[in-house]
Amino acid sequence: STHCISSAASDVYKRQGIMNKETKRKREEMDYTIEEKEMFMREALKEAEFALANDEIPIGCVLVKNGQIIGRGHNAREELQRAVMHAEIMAIEEANQQENSWRLLDTTLFVTIEPCVMCSGAIGLARIPKVIYGAKNQKFGAGGSLYDILTDERLNHRVEVESGLLEEECAAIMQNFFRNRRKK
């Protein structure tokens, strides 16, 4: 009888080992080199430039799966007169359509500024496993600065977070925008 339990437990452990290898393989597919990460963040910065050209708060975002951009977004609240039109929301929406799924598993979201509470919630709901952002958002950040929604253990989906990628460039576009806005 003990042997059967051990054998059954052994089978479970073997299956878990296989699942762990599969999970590890998937995670490795999302581990980009620093050059690749910088390339994707530069694409997010291009999106921020689009926002800036439209006199929007210059935040940009790209969502990447298997090394391909599947969603892009930039702030468009003023243009569309919709409060929820943040860069992350637009990128998630585009990726949902591209993938024909609300689940954006095996993706990495690159955004120039730390996501706010709303966007962090959307990231969790979309099951995005990894977020890489440029500069912290001390006033609205929900990825570790003001709040920590992305990694909160009380929630059923936690996100791996990296910060500080091209931080100076990401912060500079925001600082210049607000400096110029105060002059008006």
Model regions: which residues?
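Short beta-strand scaffold segments in enzyme catalytic cores
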Residues: 59-67
